[in-house]
């Protein structure tokens, strides 16, 4: 089994940090649903401002709030205004990677979705893997795909 990216929220702005909480990250259910992130699912969080990398679980906040709140010990790693990348994963047999279509949402500073992307892995007749990033229309994007400044 291989650990593979299942979905990603790229460039969310942290809206809060609550040290006096049991733990987790609070996210807008609309963002989670669109990226395929479940409540109580463990996610990796990468802070683009500090470089901190942590793992915690998701709890759902208020629908439509565009919230991104680090709770408990995680609040020490991310502060309001920091930009983060949140990624969930799935374990699959290597051959099944071609069936996955991870959703990637990118955001502006107000946590509004600015783009919806899909990752795609294919395999050619010689068995070599190929990777593509596609936009909402299915058009292939250049790799590496540069993140637009928000």
Curated annotation (Swiss-Prot):
Its EC number is 4.1.1.11. Keywords: Autocatalytic cleavage, Cytoplasm, Decarboxylase, Lyase, Pantothenate biosynthesis, Pyruvate, Schiff base, Zymogen. Catalyzes the pyruvoyl-dependent decarboxylation of aspartate to produce beta-alanine. Gene3D superfamilies: 2.40.40.20. It holds the Pfam family Asp_decarbox. It is an enzyme of class 4 (lyase). One of its GO terms (cellular component) is cytosol. It catalyses: L-aspartate + H(+) = beta-alanine + CO2. The gene is panD. NCBIfam families: panD. Is synthesized initially as an inactive proenzyme, which is activated by self-cleavage at a specific serine bond to produce a beta-subunit with a hydroxyl group at its C-terminus and an alpha-subunit with a pyruvoyl group at its N-terminus. Belongs to the PanD family. It comes from Xanthobacter autotrophicus (strain ATCC BAA-1158 / Py2). One of its GO terms (molecular function) is aspartate 1-decarboxylase activity. Heterooctamer of four alpha and four beta subunits. Pathway: Cofactor biosynthesis; (R)-pantothenate biosynthesis; beta-alanine from L-aspartate: step 1/1. PANTHER family: ASPARTATE 1-DECARBOXYLASE (PTHR21012:SF0). It is found in: Cytoplasm. Substrate binds at residues 56, 72-74. GO terms for biological process: alanine biosynthetic process; pantothenate biosynthetic process. The modification Pyruvic acid (Ser) is found at residue 24. Binds 1 pyruvoyl group covalently per subunit. It comes from the Bacteria. The keyword Plastid does not apply. This is Aspartate 1-decarboxylase. The active site is at residues 24, 57. Its cofactor is pyruvate.
């Amino acid at each position: 089994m291989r650990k593979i990216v299942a979905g990603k929220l790229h460039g969310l702005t942290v809206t809060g940090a609550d040290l006096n909480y049991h733990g987790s990250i609070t996210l807008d259910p609309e963002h989670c649903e669109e990226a395929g992130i479940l409540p109580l699912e463990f996610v990796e969080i990468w802070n683009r401002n500090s470089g901190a990398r942590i793992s915690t679980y998701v709890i759902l906040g208020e629908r439509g709030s565009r919230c991104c709140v680090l709770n408990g010990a995680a609040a020490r790693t991310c502060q309001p205004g920091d930009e983060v990348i949140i990624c969930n994963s799935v374990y699959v047999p290597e051959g099944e990677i071609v069936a996955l279509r991870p959703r990637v949402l990118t955001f502006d500073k107000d946590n509004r979705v600015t783009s919806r992307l899909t990752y795609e892995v294919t395999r050619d007749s010689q068995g070599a893997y190929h990777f593509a990033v596609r936009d909402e229309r299915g058009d292939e994007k250049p790799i590496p795909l540069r993140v637009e400044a928000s």
